[in-house]
């Protein structure tokens, strides 16, 4: 009887500790699941990323360019078997002068809108197909002044702690009064490694090819690495990320380095 009473008291005293440990493990598992969802461009989750890109030695004057991309992601159900995921990029720009006597230009750039049709039940690979649209919303000197359309594809897979995939699109101008046609490819491969505690390393360079540019001036190819972590503001989960990239291939007046800082506010179901 004494032994049983003693064991009951020990269980009673330890129960708050065990409950707290179980709760902490559950919260950590939820955070790690959110970390992987944040790394899926077509996750069925509303999110609002603010991505700030600081580009050094940009333009003929070799000054700093800054682009804040506001990138809301909004998924919709498209029947029993499909989701339709929208991704909008609204750039707020601060661009240095491109001529010796010019001045810095600040304002809104051209908005891009992408939509992907993706299966609700994924196999080993998660994928989406759709299109991209270019809207001439930019302020003067920050716009191509062209409407554009093109295809867009994304695919990724999870393998243990690894996330591997990529996103590609190409937009062509279809109308508008701008003097130059638009024919621009954007490719973003990504390779992420997830760590305990909802932390991860990321490699997600934004590779572009301006097919309208002269030979030798078309490609921008960055290489670098970043670090991210899921944390909470109150009850709201946030994906914080910092990355640094060096453009190993670039046009003559393209930037040398890019510092990317992102806060992604997530609204899971």
Predicted feature residues:
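Bacterial N-terminal signal peptides that target proteins for export
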Residues: 2-13
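Generic cytosolic/nucleocytoplasmic N-terminal low-complexity/intrinsically disordered segments
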Residues: 1-2, 228
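Transmembrane beta-barrel domains of Gram-negative outer membranes and organellar outer membranes
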Residues: 26-269
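Bacterial N-terminal signal peptides
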Residues: 11-21
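Cys/His-rich metal-coordination motifs, chiefly Zn-binding "fingers/knuckles"
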Residues: 7, 23-25
């Amino acid at each position: 009887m004494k032994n049983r009473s003693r064991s009951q008291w020990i269980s009673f005293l330890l129960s708050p500790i065990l409950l707290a440990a179980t709760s902490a493990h559950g919260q950590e598992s939820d955070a790690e699941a959110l970390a992987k969802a944040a790394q899926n461009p077509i996750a069925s989750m509303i999110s609002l990323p603010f991505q700030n890109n600081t580009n050094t030695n940009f333009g003929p004057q070799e000054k700093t360019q800054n682009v804040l991309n506001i990138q809301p992601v909004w998924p919709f159900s498209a029947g029993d078997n499909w989701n339709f995921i929208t991704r909008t990029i609204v750039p707020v720009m601060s661009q240095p002068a491109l001529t010796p006597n010019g001045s810095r230009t600040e304002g809104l750039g051209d908005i891009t809108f992408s939509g992907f049709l993706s299966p609700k039940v994924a196999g080993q690979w998660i994928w989406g197909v759709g299109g991209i649209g270019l809207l001439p919303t930019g302020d003067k000197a920050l716009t191509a002044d062209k409407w554009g359309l093109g295809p867009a594809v994304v695919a990724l897979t999870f393998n243990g702690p690894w996330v591997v995939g990529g996103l590609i699109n190409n937009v062509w101008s279809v109308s508008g009064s701008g003097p130059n046609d638009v024919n621009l490819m954007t490719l973003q491969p990504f390779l992420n490694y997830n760590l305990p505690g909802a932390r991860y390393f990321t490699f997600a360079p934004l590779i572009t090819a301006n097919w309208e540019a002269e030979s030798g001036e078309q490609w921008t190819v960055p290489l670098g690495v970043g670090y991210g972590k899921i944390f909470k503001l109150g009850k709201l989960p946030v994906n914080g990320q910092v990355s640094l990239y060096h453009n190993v291939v670039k046009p003559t007046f393209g930037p040398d380095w890019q510092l990317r800082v992102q806060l992604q506010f997530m609204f899971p179901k």
